[in-house]
Amino acid sequence: MIGRLRGTLAEKQPPHLILDVNGLGYELEVPMTTLYRLPSVGEPLTLHTHLVVREDAQLLYGFAGKRERDFFRELIRLNGVGPKLALALMSSLEVDELIRCVQSQDTSALTKVPGVGKKTAERLLVELKNRFKAWETSPAMFALVPNQPDGPAPVNTAENDAVSALISLGYKPQEASKAISAIKEKGLSSEDMIRRALKGMI
């Protein structure tokens, strides 16, 4: 099991990135909440990881901190929740926000996540309530190298990357394009576009 990787951020193509560890490039998929905390390409980066082994592939998921990684592991233990849905949940809401939804049994935020209807949200919250009684919310999130923007990407490229990232989270192409097109500010990075689009959707 690969539990943590430390190296240099070689590429980022939301929601994927490549981490160069001593010349070996690891491709990881990360939730958007981790993506927002990434340093610039070429900067050092440490990620906590979870490896999923399937018959046709080995998939590596990366997280800003151990607490976030552990939450992901709890989610995929639930009935009907795979890595894709777990990442969609964690991309739309911070871990503390998800825990507060569990504590208050509030389905409204969860039902806005692609693939989560009212009945599914209710079931997830009931199952999670027992699992997370010992968890505490904390304003201090996960330690990671502060984001250092490497300059705005060309608008078309950034927009395309942002739309592709939303589609990978389960949003329909038309929904993704509409959400990105609604952002009026120019010169934003794909990460900033994704963050604003997700806030608007939730």
UniProtKB/Swiss-Prot annotation:
Q: Which organism is it from?
A: Pseudomonas fluorescens (strain Pf0-1)
Q: Which family does the record claim for this protein?
A: Belongs to the RuvA family.
- UniProt GO molecular function: ATP binding; four-way junction DNA binding; four-way junction helicase activity
Q: Which GO terms describe its cellular component?
A: cytoplasm; Holliday junction helicase complex; Holliday junction resolvase complex
What's the name of the protein?
Answer: Holliday junction branch migration complex subunit RuvA
Q: Where is this region: Domain III?
A: 154-202
Indicate whether DNA repair appears among the record's keywords. yes
Q: Which HAMAP family match?
A: DNA_HJ_migration_RuvA (MF_00031)
